[in-house]
Amino acid sequence: MPNPLYRQHIISISDLSREQLECLLQTALKLKAHPRGDLLEGKLIGSCFFEPSTRTRLSFETAVQRLGGKVIGFSDGANTSAKKGETLADTARIISGYTDAIVQRHPKDGAARVAAEFSRVPVINAGDGTNQHPSQTLLDLVTIYETQGRLDKLKIAMAGDLKYGRTVHSLCQALKRWGCEFAFVSPPSLAMPDYITEELEEADCRYRALGSLEEAAEWADILYMTRVQRERFDEQEFAKIQGKFNLEASMLARAKPNLRVLHPLPRTDEIHPDVDAAPHAYYFEQATNGVYARMAILSLVLNEEV
């Protein structure tokens, strides 16, 4: 079967078909079960992180090395010529002359698409502002499939910062292709953006607002937690919502046995440490799946056959 992702940019989940997502998912699962160390042999990957990252940067670099490739790059845009005023377009032109693919994280929405326009090699978006995070979405799909045995018709609850959280935007855009049903738990000021709910409506996916994490845990197959970002509130407004969207183990008392709690990490206080021992907690395993998801992306983008 032809590889539908060979030499393709990976910029946004909305650019990918269900066939392409399924190809990525199955390749990640295959590489997890049967690792290969030759798929990036002789390949050099540019790791271009203009803002801080722990899991995404290290898991991409781990993926490259486990596949037999090598990495060059930077972990802070302040130490590059961007500090001198070099445009992102010129940076992409230059680095694409050195490497076989570019993995880029940038604080500005749309930055990955700009880089792709000027790069001579595939660009993989490792997060652009509040916009998209497609490799996180793939590891989420791998984790959901691994824990539920399917993606079709699942009940997905999302909680916390749904307005600015790029992970939940991308995940909605992916899971709508499998007819999932959604529930949202957030303060009104951090509700899911209209453009996402409109896409769900166009895909005939039902969604609802729920008032508490207890309700969400009882209803859902997957409870996807995110951090409510204190810096986006004044002190008085934050005081009104503080603790309301923090998950504790006692809140999972009526959860279905198959419920899994996910989180893109890092967490602060939105998941209490007592949840870690609950059978529903799966966020650390989810983070581990980042390596296999990113191995799949790199392998498919840089090989005609995998």
Swiss-Prot record:
The keyword Transferase applies. It catalyses: carbamoyl phosphate + L-aspartate = N-carbamoyl-L-aspartate + phosphate + H(+). Its EC number is 2.1.3.2. Keywords: Pyrimidine biosynthesis, Transferase. Belongs to the aspartate/ornithine carbamoyltransferase superfamily. ATCase family. GO terms for biological process: 'de novo' pyrimidine nucleobase biosynthetic process; 'de novo' UMP biosynthetic process; amino acid metabolic process. Carbamoyl phosphate binds at residues 55-56, 105, 133, 136, 265-266. Catalyzes the condensation of carbamoyl phosphate and aspartate to form carbamoyl aspartate and inorganic phosphate, the committed step in the de novo pyrimidine nucleotide biosynthesis pathway. One of its GO terms (molecular function) is amino acid binding. It is an enzyme of class 2 (transferase). Pathway: Pyrimidine metabolism; UMP biosynthesis via de novo pathway; (S)-dihydroorotate from bicarbonate: step 2/3. GO terms for cellular component: cytosol. InterPro entries: Asp/Orn_carbamoyltranf_P-bd, Asp/Orn_carbamoylTrfase, Asp/Orn_carbamoylTrfase_sf, Asp_carbamoyltransf, Asp_carbamoyltransf_Asp/Orn-bd. This is Aspartate carbamoyltransferase catalytic subunit. Heterododecamer (2C3:3R2) of six catalytic PyrB chains organized as two trimers (C3), and six regulatory PyrI chains organized as three dimers (R2).
